[in-house]
Amino acid sequence: MTRRISDKSKQILHMGEGKGKDYVPYILTSEFNSLGTTSIITDWKTGRNIHCMSQGEAMWYFLLRWDDSNIDIREQFPLDNKITVKIADELGIKHPQDRNHIMTTDFLVTKSDNSLHAYSVKVDKNLNNQI
């Protein structure tokens, strides 16, 4: 059985904060009810546990990790709620869950030039063609 941690508790616990070995993902595999396979992978560079919610995420993580230009990989990274609500409003679409729910991206990667790249890993059959 999954145990969901409230967004308020996650903020108190500083989940979704930190960098490198000190990063704690915003969503843990123990609180996620997946139709697929969740994985906890030990990162061989930082020693930190990486929480992947699907086989696709695990495969993408390995591709990211083998690229030496990726200096930090943070999974289940929380997005700024004010920005996601604004984007939904501008596009005329309903913000997922309630408007106070924190959304995440599957991976936020810091490159060696300090640029940030966000990745969402989805199976193509789960994509919605209406947007």
Question: Model-predicted segments: where are they?
Answer:
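Electrostatic, structured charged patches in enzyme active sites and in nucleic-acid/phosphate-binding
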Residues: 1-131
